[in-house]
């Protein structure tokens, strides 16, 4: 006769995969039209000039240029894409 009961399987021990959120491009980096700049949940970053806001709050470039981060109000960080003559092809 066994002195220990058979060990049952654990009800824990699983997790979902990460959602790959966050910055995809940083300040000063060159982007093409359509490039994703930030993937986020909610609006941690707000769209500025030449960027779009997707339905899942993804910020993406509408034109080719350089990424620029700036603050307008105290707690709001905006992201714009500055069209540079040297980057225009």
From Swiss-Prot:
A GO biological process held by the record: translation
Keyword Lyase: no
Signal sequence range: none
Family stated for the protein in its record: Belongs to the bacterial ribosomal protein bL27 family.
Protein name, UniProt field: Large ribosomal subunit protein bL27
Residue ranges the record marks as coiled coil: none
Pfam families: Ribosomal_L27 (PF01016)
Keyword line: Ribonucleoprotein, Ribosomal protein
GO MF annotation terms: structural constituent of ribosome
Segments crossing the lipid bilayer: none
Any one cellular-component term (Gene Ontology): ribonucleoprotein complex
SUPFAM superfamilies named among the record's database cross-references: Ribosomal L27 protein-like (SSF110324)
Source organism (scientific name): Orientia tsutsugamushi (strain Boryong) (Rickettsia tsutsugamushi)
Region of interest: Disordered: 1-26
Listed HAMAP family: Ribosomal_bL27
